[in-house]
């Protein structure tokens, strides 16, 4: 019986997703969603990663093989060997490498030591634009033998094509999708506010973003501080994990600002959470004030919940928010503009309702996960 089960498993297409960090950022969220929804009668998924050894509970709950490969040096050749061994031992048919670093480390095991299909997914223009010198030369050589290249937006795809001189038949755009069925409009936000220890009449802002400098939480906190001086019922929920040993000290900076501004009881750090769909139902407005983004999944999830959204006018975010339709775009670090945008929505419930309805419509129309899943499964075959 065990022998027959093993034979049945071997007939499946073994897919190895390679990510850099074990966190719940955009690329990791995409991999998590893909694994949850892949046709398990056809595909058997695996995951490998390089940083943050302890797997997230979300990935443990997937019940798939997980492989932590510690990357010690800037160019750690041992990672290539370990990945190659994983590919061989698990009879991996397809490797989906997310981000350029994962591509570099996956290529040896895929194309030189084994004969696996290699698919490279890139999530941001700015990461591609940062590749230069010898690494640009290396990338062009590797991608010549890579089976398919995916950009998560048309802008990322064009950037990849221009940077690496890729032929059109090798590259495609697969927009990151959101499983909209997990998110629904809260017809009674009060019950969710109470669930998370808030008052019924609190007006709640929220951000879902890991505690990294690029996510620019301090910008939002400064605007929130000004608004609190005029409205004591305002609360801010900050959902996202910090990281031990973060060289930028992002979480410490955020905590210090909250303390120095006297916001301990109104700006609440909730950490990394698995109940984001319910937390979003407690919000009145969703904000994302990043310095740069790929395609922000948390923003799309907020839209699927039917929330009005405010974000910085930077790549990634500007592709999702339609100004004066489902929310507002504000210039990076322009505190007064952010305050004004928030005030206009805080003071106008009908406008919040209008923007929220359009948010939900856009999420279903442009970012339904079914389209994303179908295209990836087609590539994996």
Language-model features, listed with the residues they occupy:
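A conserved mid-protein helix/loop that constitutes part of the nucleotide-sugar donor-binding site
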Residues: 25-33, 203, 207, 212-226, ...
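Short hydrophobic beta-strand element within catalytic cores of glycosyltransferases
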Residues: 48-49, 308-311, 321
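N-terminal strand-loop element at the rim of the active site
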Residues: 12-13, 17-81, 86, 156-157, ...
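Nucleotide-activated donor-binding/catalytic signature segment of Leloir-type glycosyltransferases, i.e.
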Residues: 251-271
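Aromatic "clamp/platform" in nucleotide-sugar-dependent glycosyltransferases that forms part
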Residues: 272, 291
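Short His-centered aromatic/hydrophobic patch
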Residues: 97-103, 122
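Conserved acidic donor-binding segment of nucleotide-sugar-dependent glycosyltransferases
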Residues: 323-324, 328-335, 344-350
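A short, well-ordered alpha-helix in the C-terminal region of glycosyltransferases
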Residues: 194, 337, 344, 351-366, ...
């Amino acid at each position: 019986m065990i022998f027959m089960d093993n034979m049945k498993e071997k007939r499946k297409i073994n897919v190895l997703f390679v990510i850099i960090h074990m966190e719940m950022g955009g690329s990791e969220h995409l991999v998590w969603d893909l694994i949850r929804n892949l046709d398990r009668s056809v595909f058997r998924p695996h995951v490998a990663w390089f940083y943050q050894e302890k797997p997230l509970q979300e990935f443990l709950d997937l019940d798939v093989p997980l492989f932590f490969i510690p990357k010690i040096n800037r160019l750690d050749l041992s990672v290539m060997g370990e990945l190659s061994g994983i590919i061989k031992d698990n009879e991996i048919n397809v490797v989906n490498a997310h981000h350029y670093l994962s591509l570099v480390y996956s290529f040896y095991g895929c194309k030189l030591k084994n004969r696996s299909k290699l698919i490279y997914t890139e999530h941001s223009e700015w990461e591609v634009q940062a590749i230069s010198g010898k690494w640009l030369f290396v990338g062009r050589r590797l991608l010549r033998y890579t089976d398919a290249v995916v950009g998560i937006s048309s802008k990322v795809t064009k950037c990849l094509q221009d940077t690496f001189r890729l032929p059109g038949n090798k590259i495609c755009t697969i927009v990151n999708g959101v499983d909209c069925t997990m998110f629904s409009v809260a017809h009674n936000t009060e019950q969710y506010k109470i669930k998370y220890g808030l008052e019924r009449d609190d007006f709640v802002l929220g951000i879902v973003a890991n505690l990294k400098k690029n996510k620019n939480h301090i910008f939002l906190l400064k605007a929130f501080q000004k608004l609190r001086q005029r409205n004591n019922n305002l609360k801010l929920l900050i959902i996202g994990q910090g990281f031990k040993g973060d060289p930028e000290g992002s979480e410490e900076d955020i905590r210090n600002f909250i303390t120095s501004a006297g916001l301990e009881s109104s700006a609440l750090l909730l950490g990394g959470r698995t109940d984001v769909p319910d937390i979003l139902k407690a919000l009145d407005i969703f904000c994302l004030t990043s310095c740069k983004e790929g395609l922000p999944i948390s923003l799309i999830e907020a839209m699927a919940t039917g929330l009005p959204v405010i974000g910085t006018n930077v790549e990634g975010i500007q592709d999702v928010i339609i100004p004066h339709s489902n929310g507002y775009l504000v210039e990076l670090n322009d505190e007064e503009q952010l305050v004004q945008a928030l005030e206009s929505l805080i003071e106008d419930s009908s406008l919040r309702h209008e923007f929220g309805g359009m948010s939900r419509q856009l999420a279903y129309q442009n970012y339904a996960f079914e389209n994303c899943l179908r295209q990836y499964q087609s590539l994996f075959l």
